[in-house]
Regions:
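Nucleotidyltransferase catalytic core that binds NTPs
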Residues: 10-174
């Protein structure tokens, strides 16, 4: 299944998946209308989310609790490879990562971005709140300045110690 196919599917295209699952996947061309329809306030976060683990799920639930909707900007495969996470990363294709995220109750919408950072994507979404994990210095991120430029805010959420996809991959590879 190609990227456009997965991100462009709608309810009823695949009876094996609930309509709400596929409806959370959003291609960039549909983003403005889909964002407009979301309840406010909108919270936005981004990441690779290669092998989803407890730390990710806790973080996403915390992010959603800060607003009425949570939009996840997902690094495309090309974008993720540029982040230097190691050889063969991401392990899971962007389509699979997007579908896993969309299946989470806390996530309202998932969209891909190809750039190294989601700054351009933020201009489309214009969330009221941008969140990142506590392993980031939120004040130094360009995304923070962008969101604050239209009156939004940015916040770092506590990092859940002991959970890391990179560490998990290293452990598996021995």
């Amino acid at each position: 299944m190609g990227r456009a196919k997965c991100m462009g599917q709608r309810a009823g295209d695949n009876p094996a998946m609930p309509a709400t699952f596929l409806d959370k996947l959003c291609a960039r061309g549909e983003l403005a209308a889909r964002i407009q329809a979301l309840p406010r306030p909108v919270v936005f976060t981004n990441g690779v989310f290669d092998i989803l683990h407890r730390g990710h799920v806790s973080y996403l639930a915390q992010a959603r609790a800060l607003g009425a909707s949570l939009v996840v900007g997902l690094n495309s495969d090309a974008s993720a490879r540029g982040l230097g996470k190691g050889p063969g990363r991401p392990l899971n294709a962007e389509i699979d990562r997007a579908c896993v995220l969309a299946a989470l109750e806390s996530v309202s919408l998932v969209t891909l971005f190809d750039e190294p950072t989601p700054v351009e994507l933020l201009d489309f979404v214009r969330p009221q709140l941008y969140v990142k994990g506590g392993d980031y210095d939120i004040e130094t991120l360009e995304e923070t300045q962008r969101v604050r430029s239209w009156g939004g805010d940015a916040r770092a959420l506590p990092f859940v110690d002991g959970y890391s996809t990179t560490a998990l991959v290293q452990r598996i590879r021995g």
